[in-house]
């Protein structure tokens, strides 16, 4: 028996629940809850090293699951891709059975969507001599951020990745991550905001105290947006050091869920 079955079947349900409204979602902090029970806080704050981001973190506070509510004007190419997205979340929501969210096919969410949505589960940050690694409970994937002084690969556009290519360095007490080479099939968020293969992303992490991590992001993609998209401040809270759950999207289970729940809810009936 696979231990992750219930978690994977939960994923589409979560998407439907998130489709209710942005306002409702915006008022419900994701931090500190799992399965309807509040998790214990990580403990009182103690002295910390601001250059050490290690720990298990979860999204906290009142913040939308995208860069900000003020998306920049799109280019004609960007607008066409946006109009073609059929989302199950927010003001443009359609029944999930009628949507085309790549996540509905178990495609990887990619970055930055994992930072917005995946971190409503948990994100662990691990540090070694030559890299910082983000490990996401949602999808159970890890993302290396190289800190050994290497440059971003010059052939990144020819070999795009779901998570892109990332390098990081410290600017005072701020950890700055620059990334390129993202697969353009991913969406930026649950609203269906698109990006092109030329998207560049900068993340700026700052550990305010032992228990609080802040993040701001800047997206630059002249093919899709008329100007850079700067996020509001995202806040994460330190969580107890507990085992990470396996939250996978399993195609075989997704297919069963679609036939039994999602398609009938959208008025699609498959004849036997």
Predicted regions: what they are:
Residues 20-272:
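PEST-like low-complexity, intrinsically disordered acidic/proline/serine-rich tracts
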Residues 1-12:
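Bacterial N-terminal signal peptides that target proteins for export
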Residues 10-20:
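Bacterial N-terminal signal peptides
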